[in-house]
Curated annotation (Swiss-Prot):
Biased composition regions of type Basic and acidic residues, renumbered to the chain: 508-521, 831-840
Gene deletion effect: Produces phialides on which short deformed hypha are formed.
Expression triggers: Expression increases significantly during initiation of conidiation and remains elevated until colourisation is stabilized. Expression is positively regulated by BrlA.
Protein's UniProt name: Conidiophore development regulator abaA
PROSITE patterns according to UniProt: TEA_2
DNA-binding region(s) in UniProt: 124-217
GO CC annotation, single: nucleus
Annotated source species: Metarhizium robertsii (strain ARSEF 23 / ATCC MYA-3075) (Metarhizium anisopliae (strain ARSEF 23))
Coiled coil residues, start to end: none
Lineage, uppermost ranks: Eukaryota, Fungi, Dikarya, Ascomycota, Pezizomycotina
Biased composition (Polar residues): 1-20
Pfam families in alphabetical order: TEA
């Protein structure tokens, strides 16, 4: 059973990065198991390996989270059992990184087999290794996803223009320097080239090897851009992109980092590229055969001579393909017993994928009517797109004997077994230039909707049984009648330049053109033979030029046997060329044949792809950047004094659950952050703790506190209270003894006020006597005159001496108490002592802090000659409140 839990071999990725985003923190778990502190027990951790699959996905778990339930503590265990390191069986599961943390290209079967063969050679250059360090292979594979598609543009860096392959080599150089400190690993002995040149050659050669493993991908052009360049005056100038849609290189973080000589902070979006690779699973059809030829069943061959229906021998020079398959078994199966007269195209090859815009933009210019009928899918998963590019070898005069027939045999394979018993149909649309129309009628879009049947069956049959047996291949209808007319009209526009080139080649083959070949060595002769752009644009259109403007696409639809709903499965885009082509304004010849490739709606040159291809690191934004500035100590102390206004008592039913007050009261009287003049401020840590003072005027139904009925005048130092006896802010003890309790002391003035045992009350904080700064200027009607804190906790007044109020009678003060002070503060409070509450020595005069309860010093009172307060032997609880206080 232990073999079931062995980790799968996964190649390392991103080990070279200096960024913390590339670090797999699950690798930091150490092997081994902590022993028990005491051996008397038998407590073990619950691994639950029998309940959880050994290949579970760990993506959703954060690296710092515990993946197992902590074992319950028993007397024989210490606290370390709560943080036990996982068992070796769990360790294998931790070390197995999920697929989302590994480059998805490593999971492509062809490339994975190659990497398995090369894994043991990576460290040995002389034995076939490429980099001698596996980290450099990871850097190379990541650079394929990181580097943007550049098209014809270059990136200027260090005074040089860099293409995509050069940028990939620069990326590997940066990684190599970060790992080894130098680029000496790329040096080749007995070579005069620089390290940079050797590294670039190594990257270029390795790129050619790796590309072969991904040629069948639908997203190949997302990984490796096409090397076919758009040359002026060339036939291959159809794959063009809009330069305006490309992102600027200045905003690319990868190129910016390489220009600065550092490792980029971004990494490839593995999840996004995994979705692109997953497009392979949605392939439903593959091209299998494409043959276009002219044959006749009336031609008879006698003594290697072909005779038509009128028994007239055919010219061998006019029909060079007559004996093409006479002495071989490679003749087309569709040909049967017919005689081949001319073959336009037959071979079928596959090329790398491209974007659908390379086809549709050409139609938008050359065939706008066809472009209007095109309905592309919104996503690549909805419908398969592919292109068939047929290169036709035109007949010289296209005059065939009577009874000849043009055949276009196109066959595709159904790769999904679920679709092999479906009914299929094909919708064909075709447009051609006006020169290739045989009549002067309306030149619109040709449309044909026909079913796809087996051989011998057609739409004319009332009951078709083609879907009763599974079909692995289907025959796509080809518009042969339309193409017979197109090919017949195309020969009426001769290609003079290619005919002249053919004559020259014929002379060279006969030996008559040797003198002209010697003269071609001079610069003057070469300049005369080279094509001119002006003359090339002024030339008359040829049959090859007109055929290139023919646009056609076919939609393949399928329907399940028990359903009536048709689903579009694939769209085949057709592009036609001839063997007579142009390259840099010069006539060239290409062999006949058909190539096909996958197409995608998503464009690798678009901003969408270039933004989705990268994953940016998590920005380490400071707290001050997201919130208001951290409060100072004075602001914390002021918040502690204002705690009564920002909290409320929940009662004795749930004293341990703090209540978070609303940010703003319904009456807009005062909010949680309105204590500061600068607007919104960070709430203090004590904002949600219950207060040590009795609360006032709190509406438990709405959860708000209305404090507009109370005001404090900071200039006169008086409190104007229009509140009831228990609705205001009580700075003095209320009448009546505090309730008895066993463990927790209760704040005065509220019998249900919760208090935290063993923790100092926030009302006991003694702040520094400094002036309140501008940040704490009063902004509401509630404000305290200074920063003195009144300690109103439960006290033992048995040993407390009263204040000597007679010394205040002769002191003249400008401030006077309001008339409502006596009514509010009377009657006089009688403080009773409870011996069980506190020890009397706690409130002895020597231990009373001056900053909290003593009178201000002389320098704080403006050099007043008034002496300090004197203590009496006994406390007089009937001292009246005078206006001087």
């Amino acid at each position: 059973m232990s073999s079931l839990f062995q980790p799968r071999p996964v190649l390392s990725s991103q080990r070279y990065s200096q960024s913390p985003d590339y670090v797999d923190t699950r690798r930091s778990i150490h092997n081994g198991r902590l022993p028990l502190r005491e051996s008397t027990g038998n407590a073990q951790s619950h691994s639950f390996n029998g309940l959880v699959s050994c290949y579970q996905n760990q993506v959703a778990l954060a690296p710092s989270m515990q993946t197992t339930i902590p074992a319950p503590m028993v007397p024989s265990q210490s606290l370390d059992c709560l943080y036990r390191v996982p068992t070796p069986r769990q360790q294998a599961r931790f070390q197995r990184r999920p697929k989302t943390s590994v480059n998805p290209l490593y999971f492509w079967p062809a490339f994975r087999q190659y990497r398995n063969r090369q894994a043991h050679k990576d460290t040995q250059k002389d034995k076939g290794g490429v980099w001698r360090r596996p980290e450099l292979e990871d850097a190379f594979v990541d650079s394929v996803l990181l580097m943007p598609h550049m098209g014809r543009r270059k990136f200027s860096m260090g005074g040089k223009l860099h293409g995509r392959n050069m940028l990939i080599s620069e990326y590997i150089f940066v990684i190599c320097i970060a790992l080894l400190g130098s680029k000496e690993i790329f040096r080749i002995d007995n070579s005069n080239e620089s390290i940079e040149q050797m590294g670039r050659k190594q990257v270029s050669s390795h790129m050619q090897v790796v590309k072969k493993f991904f040629e069948d991908l639908r997203c190949f052009h997302f990984l490796f851009p096409s090397e076919e360049k758009k040359e002026p005056g060339s036939t291959n100038s159809d794959d063009c992109y809009d330069e305006e849609e490309q992102e600027s290189f200045k905003s690319n973080p990868v190129l910016t980092a390489l220009a600065e000589g550092r490792v980029p902070d971004v990494k490839p979006n593995y999840e996004y590229f995994s979705q692109l690779l997953a497009l392979q699973s949605s392939i439903c059809t593959r091209p299998k055969t494409c043959e276009i030829f002219v044959s006749s069943s009336d031609i008879k061959i006698r003594d290697d001579v072909a005779y038509d229906v009128h028994d007239t021998p055919l010219d061998q020079a006019s029909f060079p393909h007559l004996n093409k398959y006479t002495n071989c078994d490679d003749s087309p199966n569709v040909l049967g017993k017919d005689v081949l007269l001319h073959e336009y195209t037959r071979s079928l090859d596959r090329t790398t994928s491209a974007c659908a815009k390379s086809v549709t933009r050409r139609w938008q210019h050359d065939a706008p009517a066809m472009y209007e009928t095109l309905e592309l899918p919104s996503r690549d998963e909805e419908c398969l797109l592919l292109e068939m590019c047929a290169t036709l070898e035109l007949h010289e005069h296209a005059k065939f004997p009577s009874g000849s027939e043009l055949t276009g045999f196109v066959e595709v394979a159904i790769t999904q077994p679920a679709l092999q018993n479906h009914r299929w149909k094909c919708i064909t649309r075709l447009t051609r230039p006006a020169e290739l129309h045989s009549d002067e009628g309306k030149h619109g879009v040709y449309t044909n909707d026909s079913g796809i049947h087996r051989r011998g069956c057609s739409d004319s049959k009332a009951e078709c049984e083609c879907h009763t047996r599974p079909r692995q291949d289907i025959h796509v209808p080809f518009p042969a009648v339309e193409w017979a007319s197109i090919l017949s009209m195309a020969v009426q526009y001769p290609d003079v330049e290619h005919q002249r080139l053919k004559e020259k080649r014929r002379k060279y083959a006969d030996g008559d053109g040797k003198k002209e070949l010697e003269r071609a060595g001079s610069k003057r002769k070469r300049s005369e033979d080279e094509g001119d752009a002006a003359s090339w644009t002024r030339r008359e259109p040829t049959g090859s030029d007109l055929i290139c403007k023919v646009a056609m696409y076919q939609e393949l639809w399928s329907c399940a046997p028990d359903s009536t709903q048709w689903t579009r499965q694939a769209i085949i885009f057709w592009r036609f060329n001839t063997t007579n082509q142009w390259h840099k304004y010069n006539p060239v010849f290409k062999p006949a044949g058909t190539t096909w490739r996958w197409l995608t709606i998503n464009d690798p040159m678009s901003r969408y792809h270039q933004q989705k291809a990268l994953v940016y690191p998590t920005a380490n934004v400071s707290r001050d950047a997201l919130m208001s500035p951290t409060p100072t100590i004075h602001q914390h102390l002021t918040a502690a004094m204002n705690e009564t206004f920002n909290s409320w008592d929940q009662g004795s039913s749930a004293p341990h659950v703090p209540h978070v007050p609303p940010l703003q009261t319904p009456n807009n009287s005062i909010g949680l952050f309105d204590s500061f003049s600068n607007g919104l401020a960070t709430p203090p840590p004590t904002a949600t703790l219950p207060p040590a003072y009795p609360t006032g005027n709190f509406d438990s139904r709405s959860g708000s506190f209305d404090a507009r009925s109370a005001s404090f005048d900071t200039r006169s130092g008086s409190f104007d209270g229009n509140l009831g006896p228990n609705n205001g802010v009580a700075f003095l003890p209320t009448t009546g003894p505090p309730p008895q309790h066993e463990r927790q002391p209760t704040a005065l003035g509220n019998n249900n006020q919760p208090f935290f045992d063993g923790q100092q009350s926030f009302s006991e904080v003694k702040p520094i006597n400094t002036a309140v700064n501008s940040y704490m200027t009063a902004s509401t009607s509630l404000e305290l005159p200074n920063q003195l804190v009144y300690d109103n906790s439960g006290v033992d007044t048995s040993n407390m001496q009263g204040w000597d109020m007679s010394a205040l009678d002769g002191w003249s003060a400008a401030a006077s108490a309001p008339g409502s002070a006596t009514a509010e503060w009377g009657p006089n409070t009688k403080v009773e002592s409870h011996a069980g509450d506190h020890h009397g020595a706690m409130w002895a005069p020597p231990h009373w802090p001056l900053s909290a309860g003593a009178a201000p010093s002389s320098h704080e009172r403006g050099a007043s000659p008034r002496p300090l307060k004197r203590r009496r032997e006994t406390m007089d609880v009937h001292v009246p409140v005078t206006a001087g206080w």
